[in-house]
């Protein structure tokens, strides 16, 4: 269940840090420290630098966030 007062933004993962923590650059240019949500941990979704992600931010601390979704890449490999 999503909380009402969270800010939802998109960005790109720039760096992978220990303990499922990542540094991401949001579309507005801000750098945030993010971690993976519990649902993504349970589903074993891998996040790599360069992936597009959707991040939830608290209005009280805009430097930390939670990755809630990994967006699909636009590039498709047709040479199966």
Swiss-Prot record:
A GO CC term assigned to this protein in UniProt: cytosol
The alphabetical list of record keywords is: Chloroplast, Initiation factor, Plastid, Protein biosynthesis, RNA-binding, rRNA-binding
Main location per UniProt? plastid
Where in the numbering of this chain does the S1-like domain appear? 1-72
Highest taxon, organism lineage: Eukaryota
Q: Where in the cell is it found?
A: Plastid, Chloroplast
According to its UniProt entry, the function of this protein is described as:
One of the essential components for the initiation of protein synthesis. Stabilizes the binding of IF-2 and IF-3 on the 30S subunit to which N-formylmethionyl-tRNA(fMet) subsequently binds. Helps modulate mRNA selection, yielding the 30S pre-initiation complex (PIC). Upon addition of the 50S ribosomal subunit IF-1, IF-2 and IF-3 are released leaving the mature 70S translation initiation complex.
User: Partners and quaternary state?
Assistant: Component of the 30S ribosomal translation pre-initiation complex which assembles on the 30S ribosome in the order IF-2 and IF-3, IF-1 and N-formylmethionyl-tRNA(fMet); mRNA recruitment can occur at any time during PIC assembly.
Q: Name the family the entry cites.
A: Belongs to the IF-1 family.
Q: HAMAP family from the xrefs?
A: IF_1
Protein name (Swiss-Prot/TrEMBL): Translation initiation factor IF-1, chloroplastic
Give the organism the record lists: Adiantum capillus-veneris (Maidenhair fern)
* Name of encoding gene: infA
């Amino acid at each position: 269940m999503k909380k009402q007062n969270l800010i939802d933004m998109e960005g790109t993962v720039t760096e992978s840090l220990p303990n499922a923590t990542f540094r991401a650059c949001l579309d507005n240019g801000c750098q945030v420290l993010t971690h993976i949500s519990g649902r993504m941990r349970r589903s074993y979704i891998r996040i790599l630098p360069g992936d597009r992600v959707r991040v939830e931010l608290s209005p009280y601390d805009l430097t930390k966030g939670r990755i809630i979704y990994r967006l699909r890449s636009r590039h498709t490999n047709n040479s199966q």
